[in-house]
Amino acid sequence: FKDIKLELNNLTLFTGVNSAGKSSAIQAILLLLQQRQSENGLLNGKYIKLGRFQEVRNTIINARKIDIGMTVKNADDEFECSIAINSEEKITKNNFEKIKGLDFVYLCAERIGVEDVYKQNLEKEYRIGIHGEYAFDYLSKERMNSIAEQDFRNMEEETGSNFGNQVDYWLNYIMGYSITAERIPGTEI
């Protein structure tokens, strides 16, 4: 894309035919968000690994620079942040102080397969992991936490008001089973 504007919400789903630009749009967003982890900027980081500038630039127009930006709006604020990548792979960042606090979860299409045991998440940011590798750890830690009533998609009296009961309800409703995740004391699994 030379220029595209996308409106994103709490859950955004990209659909379309092959080579329509879904992955390119997602990679641009991920590239911006992974700049939170580095002062110098990253083409290769936690969310994506793009390689080198020469591999991602538009060779048809002989691009010597890549510019990517986004505007973030929420109830309290609106701000823009952007990056520019030149042929020497120098990344110039603009206004990334505010994006550091942006709540963002990315679950890659390539997820972890079936394992005998799953590792605990020992990272500072407590999530399910980019590949879902910490999903069971997250479930074991959050199982008993209450969920706000407005977040229920079914009747509370049918399932209870905690995260684990809601997960079990929906797994049973969709696939006919429930799940238990427990930590093994004295280990990181």
What are these model-derived regions, one by one?
Residues Q35-I189:
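Phosphate-coordinating catalytic segments in nucleotide- and nucleic-acid-processing enzymes
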Residues F1-L31:
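Pre-Walker A-like glycine/lysine-rich segment at the N-terminus of P-loop NTPase domains
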